[in-house]
Amino acid sequence: MRIDGRKNEQIRHVKVTRHYTKYAEGSVYIEVGDTKVLCNVSIEDKVPPFMKGTGSGWITAEYNMLPRSTETRKIRDIARLKIDGRTMEIQRLIGRALRSVVDLKALGEKTLWIDCDVIQADGGTRTTAISGAFIALVDAVNKLHKIKPFKIYPIRSFVAAVSVGIVNEEKILDLCYQEDSKAKVDMNIIMTDEGSFVEVQGTGEESPYTRAELNELLDLGEKGIKQMINVQKESLKMDSLWIGTGGNN
């Protein structure tokens, strides 16, 4: 029996609140168990210097944990005058995950800024940020599409992320913090609704793991991705109909 009574192949309860803030073009407050993340998407009508003149857009992400998102106060990055390595790794991961399902050429020379702020952390903050940010991204892109329809709708597929791991020799899905801190193996999996992998990050925290264990964890992660994408689809409802069509229907 897991700490919160879940089955091994069950993700935590997910609650999504769209249009959470009024200024961002896309804004989602996502709660996965006790992990809570605010995901805002802002649109700029320009691209970074290295993209100028290419006709393509860009998606970049920033990730931040509020000081009391954790059990003890976390010092803000600005107070240290630098971004810590973990933060840099996670925001790059979020950016890569979202770019993987967007046709940047179809987007045009615009930058989509993804801001993910962790309000409360109980494991899986990066996976929660990716899954929530995708919904906010759809809302932001749809705003553009309704004002001036894209020739090719830029979002090609859904993308979501989950964690899996081995705890007490049990393979489990969507680890909370207590489970994560005891994990022999910890892995983050990002996939599309088409079953394609975007990224797999796996670490043997205490000991190496076998190819057979890796395969089992990937299968478990795929089950979790399907659950999370179902949540995304239920949240977006009719606003998800353009995804993957490439057209203006």
Swiss-Prot record:
GO MF terms, alphabetically ordered: 3'-5'-RNA exonuclease activity; tRNA binding; tRNA nucleotidyltransferase activity
Binding, phosphate: R86, G124, T125, R126
EC code(s) of this entry: 2.7.7.56
The reaction(s) this protein catalyses: tRNA(n+1) + phosphate = tRNA(n) + a ribonucleoside 5'-diphosphate
Family statement: Belongs to the RNase PH family.
Subunit structure: Homohexameric ring arranged as a trimer of dimers.
Protein name per its UniProtKB record: Ribonuclease PH
Protein's organism: Clostridium botulinum (strain Eklund 17B / Type B)
